[in-house]
Amino acid sequence: MKLSLVVAVLCLVLLPAASFGQGEPGWNKHSLGANFELSIPMGDFADFLAGTGYGGNVRYQFGADSRGVFTATAGYLSWSKKDLGAGTSVQPAAFNIFLGGKYYVTDGFYASLEGGLYFVNYTYEGVVVGAEGNTTRFMLPIGVGFQKSGFEIGARYMLLDVDFNSFSFTLGYNFAL
């Protein structure tokens, strides 16, 4: 009795997972994925504005051919507070929207290029006064990664303006549609 219950539960879990998973590239194939993202700021962005960031993305992929994929990505990142001294700190956060593509060089390995907008919100906290500001910036993420059986891992260099760049590392899963 217990063994048949275990087998039934495994079938109920594994069979749908196998059919929904494996969002792989290919002609006219669609997938929807979710990624966790870790962002490490570089240059002036790290020196004056942000600590380590974290967030997530949702990505739609449409297969243009056996190696090329069009992508549409939306996500949110929040960086840790940066102490500016004299009792002041700043904490940026951003909502992003990107359009671009991936090219699968070999089975599973890809290079990606996207472009889009970062809607950035800065929160300043001081001893006497606090302030909040918003700005919109153009972003150009250039990356590499590996995708197999729906699972995806990647690294991107995020070009934001001239001095506000970061490395981002992603880990996620893609569901075939």
Feature map (PLM): residue ranges:
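Positively charged n-region of N-terminal signal peptides that target proteins for export
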Residues: M1-L5, Q22
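Bacterial N-terminal signal peptides
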Residues: V7-P16
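Short glycine/proline- and aromatic-enriched beta-strand/turn motifs that initiate or cap beta-hairpins
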Residues: F20-T71, L77, M158, F167-S168, ...
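Residues that define the transmembrane beta-barrel architecture of outer-membrane proteins
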Residues: N28-L32, F48-G56, Q91-F95, N134-L140, ...
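Residues on the lipid-exposed face of transmembrane beta-strands in outer-membrane beta-barrel proteins
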Residues: A34-L38, G56-F62, Y76, I97-Y103, ...
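Outer-membrane beta-barrel translocator domains and adjoining extracellular loop/strand segments
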Residues: D44-G51, K82-V90, Y122-A131, D163-T170
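Repeated loop/turn-to-beta-strand initiation elements of outer-membrane beta-barrel proteins
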Residues: S66-F70, G108-A111, K148-G154, L177
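Outer-membrane beta-barrel translocator/channel fold
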Residues: G75-P92, S112-Y122, G154
